[in-house]
Each structure stands twice: as C-alpha cells, then as structure tokens.
UniProtKB/Swiss-Prot annotation:
An annotated GO cellular component: plasma membrane
The keyword Transmembrane helix is assigned to this record: yes
UniProt name for this protein: Putative transport protein CGSHiGG_02670
Keywords per UniProt: Cell membrane, Membrane, Repeat, Transmembrane, Transmembrane helix, Transport
PROSITE patterns: RCK_C (PS51202)
Annotated organism of origin: Haemophilus influenzae (strain PittGG)
Record's bilayer topology term: Multi-pass membrane protein
UniProt keyword Repeat present: yes
Lineage, uppermost ranks: Bacteria, Pseudomonadati, Pseudomonadota, Gammaproteobacteria, Pasteurellales
Amino acid sequence: MSDIAITISLLALVAVIGLWIGHWKIRGVGLGIGGVLFGGIIVAHFTNQYGLKLDAHTLHFVQEFGLILFVYTIGIQVGPGFFSSLRKSGLKLNAFAILIIVLGSIAVVLVHKIADVPLDIALGIYSGAVTNTPALGAGQQILAELGVPQTTVTMGVSYAMAYPFGICGILLAMWLIRLFFNVKVDDEAARFNAESSQDKESLHNISLKVTNQNLDGLTLIQIPGFSDEEVVCSRLKRDDMEIVPKASTEIRTNDILQLVGDDNSLAKMRLIIGHEVDAPTVAYSGEIRSERVVVTNEKVLGKKIRALGIHQKYGVVISRLNRAGIELVPTGNTTLQFGDVLHMVGRSDVLNQAISVIGNAQQKLLQVQMLPVFIGIGLGVLVGSIPFYIPGFPVALKLGLAGGPLVVALILARIGTIGKLYWFMPPSANLALREIGIVLFLAVVGLKSGGSFFDTLVNGSGLEWMGYGIFITFVPLIIVGTIARLYGKLNYLTICGLLAGSMTDPPALAFANEIKEDNGAAALSYATVYPLVMFLRIMSPQLLAVLLWAA
C-alpha cells in the first residue's frame, strides 16, 4: 500500500476507535467527540512501534480541512443567534461567560510566566482545560505564523493531558456550587418556571374593543401604532362579520380588533383604542384561517414584505415572523430570508395563493445548497489570510484558518440571503459536516501526538501539565459561579448552563439537563452564551500567543 492509502486507512481506524471510546460513559458522562483524540494517541503508539510511515502532507491537509469544516459549520449554526445573544436579555449571562474566558486567559499567563511553561504547551493545556478543540487549532495556526516549530506534537500532547479534567472540572464546579449554597433543585426549577411563564414568548394576541370615539371613521393606517408598524391587526370583527382588515379599512366604534405585538406596544394600543375583551384568539371562524408558512421560494428571498404586495393582492396579513427561534413583528420593510416562518391570516379561498408566493416547500428545508458552502469556505480562508496591524504588536495578526471561516460564516448566516444564494443549512447536514470536520482534525492531532504521549505521561511533565489544566479549568468556573449566585442572583440551573456554555461542552450540558430533566433553564442559558463564547474561545489563544510571544 502507498503511504497515502496507509494514512487514510489509519485515519478511519482512529475515527472508529475514538468514537467507540467516546461512547463510554461513567455515571452518564463520557469523552464524547474527544474520544477521537485518544483513539489517535493509541493508534499512533502502535504505528511508532511497528515503524509504519504516514504521509505528512496528507495529514496536514486533512487536519486543516477538518478544522475549516468544523468552524465554518459552527458559524453557520450560531450565526443567526450570535448578534441577538448580545442584546439586553443576554447581557448578564454573556458578561459572566466573558469573565470566565478572561480569568482562564489570566491563568494561562500565570502558568506561562510563573511556572515557566513553554508557550505552545501552555496554549495546549488551555485548549484542553476548556475542552475547546477549535482553540487548539487556532493556537497551532498562530504559533506556526510566529515561526514556533513542532507545535502540533507538543500542543496535542498537552491538550490531551488537560482534556479529561476539563470535562470533570465543570461537573465538579456545578456540584460544589450546589453544596456551598445549599441549593434545592426543585425550588430553583419552580422559580425558573414562574419567571419564564411571565415572558414565555415575545409576542402576544389581544382583542380590543374600539371605544375611543375619535377613531370612528379613521382608516387603520391612520391610527397611531399601526402607522409605526409596532403592532399588526390580524382580523376585525364587526357585529357578526369577520374580516382580515387592510390598511385602508375604516374603523367603527364597537369594532373588535385582534392585535399582535409585544407587551409594551399592546399596552399603548389599549390606551388609544379601548378596553380588552374576551374573544377567541386562536380559532378562526367562518372562511378565515391561519397558517404557518416557511419561506422557501427563491424569488422572494431578499425582498421586503411590502414589495410582495401580499396584503394588497390577497388581503392576507402576516402577523408574526419567526427567524432562528426569535419572534419578530413583521413590517413592510422586513426582508425575507430562507427558512423564515410566517404566521399568515386570510380568507381560505385566497390564502393558498398567498402561500404559493412564499413557497412553503418543506422538502427544500432538507436540501443543501452546496454552492454557498464552498463560497463561504473560500471567503473564510481568504479573510483568515489577510494580515492586519495593531499598534504595539510586533507582528501582523491574522484570523487564520480557524478564525476566518468562523467570522465569515457568522456574517453570512446573519445576512441569510444574497440574490438566489442562501446560507441556510438543514440542522442534520450541518451536524454531519461539523462532526466529520472535528473527527478528521482530532484524528490527525492524536496521530501526531501519540508517539510521545505515554512517555510524557510516565517519564516527563505529564502530571504537572494535568495540574496546570486543573487550575485553568476549575478556578475561573468556581469564581464566576459563586459571583453569579451571590451577586448576580442567578438561578442555579441557569448557572449550570452558563458554566457548560462557557466551555462549549455538550457532555456538561447533558449533565446539567439531568439535574432537573423537565426544566429548560440550563439549555436556555447554554444557548444564550454559546455563540459569543465559541467565537472568543477561538480568538483568545491567538491573542495570548501574540502577546506572550512578544513579551
């Protein structure tokens, strides 16, 4: 067999062994995808003993391409929620997550400066301690740019030494916080449910009776609130007649209007229109019905709702828009993106015509447009290769193959659509590409690190590196967890999700979810901090490398 054939065969073997190891669980917690790294270490140990030669160029390409695939698909996944997670509702959680990253970075500086640990090893320990594989790839990239040789081997070994406690340390921090504050999980779950039920969704329906005599005879668009597009009137009831109103529909005293909007906007409309009445808000009687419609028609992508003329042509109202799990009040200037879910209300005989304009082809949600994928990857590599200079830094910085595709993917996923190209990717396809990418990357890192892993563990500084990893993992988590509980007054289950999200660690999230299985607090806080944390985890080793290398 050729060297390339042997290399590919061993990569497949590493993936099989590693994924098998990753499925081993102790009390419900396992290595997960990190098992591939240890599968590579085991295989490399025996290949070195038997003198098998691997093709270095193939390994290098597979490692870099796997990293690119992983970070690009991560960016596409979290992109729509990345910028919204920075809004006011998630500021406190994201601030605590950033504090964990900052404290972890300070710990790396202390390990490097005080303990005199070489920079490449310190960054490898950091990546393993925070269980973030893209951070390892980013660190290797920047050190290679700085001219530090043989970083793959040393960083891979130190990463592997710190990784196991990186997972266990999060679980230990959760347990100690629970013990220290004498937390009663059932009480925490009840408190979270009570708080979340008050604001379970961003938009609400109410029915208002027109009692303001000044509105009699005015058209809908002339009433304050509708002209500002703060709320949507999805239907109007007058005596026994029920219609979907247009902007030009005249309003009469005693009409009942069903409105959709956020709490503040609806409160204003109560003052303007009249008092709230009990009226059906879900069932649509007569010929009026509502449908949830998915935007799949390429002809409407990037167009504004006003330009489609759906309301004018068919008398259909778009009362809600759900984008990446976030509910919005649609306005005439709202631009449609692939995968948007619209709540449409109209007469049965014309609603289907309006739906055909939007698309609602469910099978398209299962298809992947490959052209945007490779455009995004290509742009990401180009952006990652652009040097930018910061005063005081000795070398030009680059986002690299880890940061470039991530930043581009975040932006493209946020934009959503350019012409007929859309960057929506079905979750199953995204997960498949992401898993393939990280398996390839970890398999190569394991193969390159395995030759010296056991020797370092037994005869070298392996145990010392483990100790530094415990320090980097545990100290930031326990400090921020205590502050979040003591001063931030955060729910314990929310703190568990925050700690897991700050390490981008799915096994830790699984553990947090099992603390109270019927409660979504941990998953919600994990999802809130995950996008920003993933970005910062990839960028932080690069900044640390440049700062410490220059010092």
